[in-house]
Amino acid sequence: QVDCSLAPASGGTCQPDVATLWHALRGENYELDVDIDKMMEAAAVFKDCMSDYFIPPEAKAVEPMIPWSPMPGGALTANTQMMRDNNLMDKYEECISAMSEVVKRGGFATSVTPVSQFYFQQAFNNVIFGPWEKFAEGYGKMVLGYFGKTPVEPDSEIIELASKKMNLQPTKENPVDLND
């Protein structure tokens, strides 16, 4: 089974376009079981419906670094909109590249909201202020244990830096007890 999407929502933060995959797989051992003419018709209607909406270019472009970041589509467009609003889109590629280290050294927590935001905010801080000079509040509290345990223990150097820069001690307490 292969997941596909319709242009103009396919690509960057979504699955590949159904027509592109259909064409690429024609004549191979695997074919998409779709009526391509109906799909193209639906794509034209969808494209017309979406013409009233702003779709950021990075949401439509394939970015090969995304699987290593990892940055889910909703977080990507929210964060790039913030960068666009502040004239910082020139830092986009650096931030996406910086995320891999942030995820790895932060304990590999699941990259969904709010953790995907923590990752991006920390990667952004690392790019703008220098590596590990300023900790994003959510990321720092996560590596210090305030939201529970990450799948892998965060890097001890990052725990130490976050504790020092945020003036917070690491904790192993139950997050429910901490936030009661």
Show the residue positions of the predicted features.
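Core active-site phosphate/anionic-ligand binding loop and the adjoining beta-turn-alpha structural block
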Residues: 22-25, 32-88
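Glycine-rich phosphate-binding active-site loops on the catalytic face of alpha/beta enzymes
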Residues: 1-16
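Short, surface-exposed, polar/charged, turn-prone segments marking secondary-structure boundaries
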Residues: 6-7, 29-33
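Active-site-proximal loop->helix
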Residues: 14-24
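Generic alpha-helix signal with a bias toward terminal, lower-confidence helices
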Residues: 11-14, 46, 58, 155, ...
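Terminal or standalone catalytic/regulatory effector modules within metabolic enzymes
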Residues: 60-65, 70-180
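Glycine-rich beta-alpha junction loops
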Residues: 8, 43-46, 103-106
